[in-house]
């Protein structure tokens, strides 16, 4: 993006750059967790490359500590770029503004999603002080709310993905077709016995237990199938509930905060 600033209008250059930096950090961090040693095993262990250019170049493998440092550097730079993010400034955005590009910030790596990801990375690193600071900033923003029970009780228009809790989510227009292969109650589906489901949630008052599972039919009536990603057919079903696959959510910030306080 460097040298192409004149191609963008308004705040778009810095906001898009911030999102791109954050996405690079997100993807690299997940790759590290899969293919690299954890920070608790050894910060000096050789892990994987951190790719910073779109080029036919072989990048050197990084030590775990150096790799995590580069993840955090990208996230810090991203947060700086996103200082004018509407989710942070409170600026109202409509379709009139650049065709609404900066609307629906929860399906972009917005400022608070970056802070949430920083909390995740700092916790992984063992830097509990900074993890707590970042988690508290997200929680204290007031931009994300716990799902309300009244938005779950009507099965035809329920907020099954708990969308108000999303810091960052993907909008996958084919999500229904994907999950129906595995969660539709057929022979090849993933399912839980009712007894096991009760063990997991322990209380019939847990919203996940009450509203996110459906009962199998016929010979499968003892099984419970996840319906969190079901795509409902009602025309009244809110657009903000559709096709959402959450990647960073509000509850994680509370878990991080709790672990930091414990440490």
Feature-to-residue mapping (PLM):
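Structured, solvent-exposed acidic/aromatic patches
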Residues: 1-22, 29-251
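C-terminal soluble interaction/assembly domains
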Residues: 240, 261-263
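Active-site-proximal region of nucleotide-activated glycan assembly enzymes
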Residues: 258
């Amino acid at each position: 993006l460097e040298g192409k600033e004149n191609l963008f209008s308004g705040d778009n250059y810095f906001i898009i750059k911030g999102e791109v930096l954050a996405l690079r950090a997100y993807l690299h961090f997940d790759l590290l967790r899969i293919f690299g040693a954890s920070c608790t095993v050894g910060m000096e262990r050789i892990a994987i490359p951190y790719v910073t250019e779109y080029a036919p170049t072989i990048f050197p493998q990084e030590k775990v500590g150096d790799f995590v440092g580069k993840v955090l550097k990208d996230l810090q730079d991203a947060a700086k770029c996103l200082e004018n993010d509407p989710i942070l400034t409170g600026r109202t955005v409509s379709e009139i503004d650049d065709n609404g590009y900066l609307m629906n910030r929860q399906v972009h790596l917005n400022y608070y999603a970056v802070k949430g990801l920083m909390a995740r990375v700092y916790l992984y690193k063992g830097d509990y002080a900074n993890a707590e600071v970042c988690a508290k900033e997200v929680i204290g923003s007031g931009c994300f709310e716990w799902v309300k029970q009244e938005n779950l009780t009507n099965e035809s228009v329920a907020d099954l993905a708990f969308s108000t809790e999303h810091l960052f989510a993907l909008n996958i227009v084919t999500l229904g077709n994907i999950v129906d292969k595995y969660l539709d109650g057929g022979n090849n589906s993933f399912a839980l016995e009712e007894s096991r489901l009760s063990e997991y949630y322990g209380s019939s008052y847990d919203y996940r237990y009450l509203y996110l599972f459906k009962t199998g039919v016929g010979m499968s009536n003892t099984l419970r199938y996840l319906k969190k990603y079901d795509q409902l057919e009602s025309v009244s079903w809110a657009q903000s509930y559709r096709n959402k696959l959450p990647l960073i959510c509000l509850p994680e910030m509370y878990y991080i905060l709790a672990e930091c306080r414990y440490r």
